[in-house]
Amino acid sequence: MAIDEDKQKAISLAIKQIDKIFGKGALVRLGDKQVEKIDSISTGSLGLDLALGIGGVPKGRIIEIYGPESSGKTTLSLHIIAECQKNGGVCAFIDAEHALDVHYAKRLGVDTENLLVSQPDTGEQALEILETITRSGGIDLVVVDSVAALTPKAEIDGDMGDQHVGLQARLMSHALRKITGVLHKMNTTLIFINQIRMKIGMMGYGSPETTTGGNALKFYASVRIDIRRIAALKQNEQHIGNRAKAKVVKNKVAPPFREAEFDIMFGEGISKEGEIIDYGVKLDIVDKSGAWLSYQDKKLGQGRENAKALLKEDKALANEITLKIKESIGSNEEIMPLPDEPLEEME
């Protein structure tokens, strides 16, 4: 439907005035502006990249990764940092918990020499640092570990028994209102690691769990990932890692509620090779005959761990199988579920 000529002139005049005051592009017709593809940063997990729908976490958005203790939240975040750095990105880690293991981060592929790290004393200090580096325009990714550790100054200065109801929630709400627009403008991705708590007096239906820091983060986050440990990985009766399940419980850039499972090996992080084998077998790209796994005419090994070791050594072969998996699933198709039963015995 055509717009009245007088209205067109009035709108054009208003746009010129707005551009003069706020800068060009402050108000545009959507038809005049080319819709840009959403860029992403890989998570370091093939399955989770597929579950997120765009190949990773979106750039310029807020992401929340939450789950129980020792479920792999920080490990996943460090993998995202490593992937961002591989593509020339500048990353920062705000360590509010004062618990960053630099040696472990290095083993996951993080360039620790060029990683910006802050260990703030208060929640206000952490969020001020976050806002300053984001406004600089030079940062591609910031990870805050964790929301629960962003303690307001009033709580730190007060006595041990003092009640400070809602202080942290108000702090988070204020900070998110200020930085959301800046993140989009600077194309900076912000990841909040969060913990879960049990709701007090929860009765009847619904999940008894909730995340810390109030409701603001739930609304402002474009992606929320719930990660849980679901099994223990064993080899020769030795506990060598955990099996984790990540569920995308909120996604503003692709369909939500997709899931991915992957191995987190102690001292090594997410096992990409394990995912290649799992998806390869599911899609009939990797053949499984008894305990033996093979790809085309090449035997990968007897048992999952041996096959993983071979793929770890032969990067070219691992990349070839990964490409075939991505082509088989297709960018617009629903992600295929992983095998119901793992290929190796788990606890």
Swiss-Prot record:
Its Gene Ontology cellular component terms are: cytosol
Q: Where in the cell is it found?
A: Cytoplasm
Report the domain of life of the source organism. Answer: Bacteria
Kindly give the Gene3D superfamilies that the UniProt entry links to this protein. Answer: P-loop containing nucleotide triphosphate hydrolases
One GO MF annotation is:
ATP-dependent DNA damage sensor activity
The record, for InterPro entries, names:
AAA+_ATPase, DNA_recomb/repair_RecA, DNA_recomb/repair_RecA_CS, P-loop_NTPase, RecA-like_C, RecA-like_N, RecA_ATP-bd, RecA_C_sf
One Pfam family it belongs to = RecA
Q: Which GO terms describe its biological process?
A: DNA recombination; DNA repair; SOS response
- Please provide the record's keywords in A-Z order: ATP-binding, Cytoplasm, DNA damage, DNA recombination, DNA repair, DNA-binding, Nucleotide-binding, SOS response
Residues the entry annotates as binding ATP: 67-74
Q: Which family does it belong to?
A: Belongs to the RecA family.
What function is annotated for this protein? Answer: Can catalyze the hydrolysis of ATP in the presence of single-stranded DNA, the ATP-dependent uptake of single-stranded DNA by duplex DNA, and the ATP-dependent hybridization of homologous single-stranded DNAs. It interacts with LexA causing its activation and leading to its autocatalytic cleavage.
Q: Return the HAMAP family for the record.
A: RecA
Please report the name of this protein according to its UniProt entry. Protein RecA
From which organism does this entry originate? Answer: Helicobacter pylori (strain Shi470)
Q: Which gene carries the instructions for this protein? A: recA
